[in-house]
From Swiss-Prot:
PROSITE patterns: CYTB_NTER. One of its GO terms (molecular function) is electron transporter, transferring electrons within cytochrome b6/f complex of photosystem II activity. One of its GO terms (biological process) is respiratory electron transport chain. Binds 2 heme b groups non-covalently with two histidine residues as axial ligands. Heme 1 (or BH or b566) is high-potential and absorbs at about 566 nm, and heme 2 (or BL or b562) is low-potential and absorbs at about 562 nm. The lineage of its organism: Eukaryota, Viridiplantae, Streptophyta, Embryophyta, Tracheophyta. It comes from Gossypium hirsutum (Upland cotton). Its main location: plastid. Component of the cytochrome b6-f complex, which mediates electron transfer between photosystem II (PSII) and photosystem I (PSI), cyclic electron flow around PSI, and state transitions. The keyword Chloroplast applies. Keywords: Chloroplast, Electron transport, Heme, Iron, Membrane, Metal-binding, Photosynthesis, Plastid, Thylakoid, Transmembrane, Transmembrane helix, Transport. GO terms for cellular component: chloroplast thylakoid membrane; membrane. NCBIfam families: PRK03735.1 (NF002990). This is Cytochrome b6. HAMAP family: Cytb6_f_cytb6.
Amino acid sequence: MSKVYDWFEERLEIQAIADDITSKYVPPHVNIFYCLGGITLTCFLVQVATGFAMTFYYRPTVTEAFASVQYIMTEANFGWLIRSVHRWSASMMVLMMILHVFRVYLTGGFKKPRELTWVTGVVLGVLTASFGVTGYSLPRDQIGYWAVKIVTGVPEAIPVIGSPLVELLRGSASVGQSTLTRFYSLHTFVLPLLTAVFMLMHFLMIRKQGISGPL
């Protein structure tokens, strides 16, 4: 085993990387509330894992979506547990994100030189809300259908561009297969990719600038 480690150490300098990670200075004022961002990340990772597991059974069509969710909950091995964990971690992610935003704001973590860290955090907040909207529609039940119909219908009040914007969101004039396909693609590919990119930017900035000091 030591020879394998030495082989990687010689080429990648693993020990230097580990020392840099473990020796990072942590200010003495840091408390449990500074863990809220990390908990949000953990919830996101749980979402990715459980969501990926459900893609093996979920069918993104208006005729089969609801039945496939029923199959996950009643027949697939541990499907009920995987979907329940997905829902619980989604709620937890939103709650932890909100508390994290309050903590950062109340401790002045958005001030110079951390403005860009705050901006990436705001983008992550928008992406998290988008996860909720798109995911809500996927079971294709009554609640999801009417929620999507209302949310996508909001831009219609905008003069001139309102109706085209609604059609862009829905993929057609009404909520149907095109809407479900778009929301499924957003929920399972586009939003996770964007979230991963902005999380990486967010953490690299924190890593570079360190944790903000006390007020």
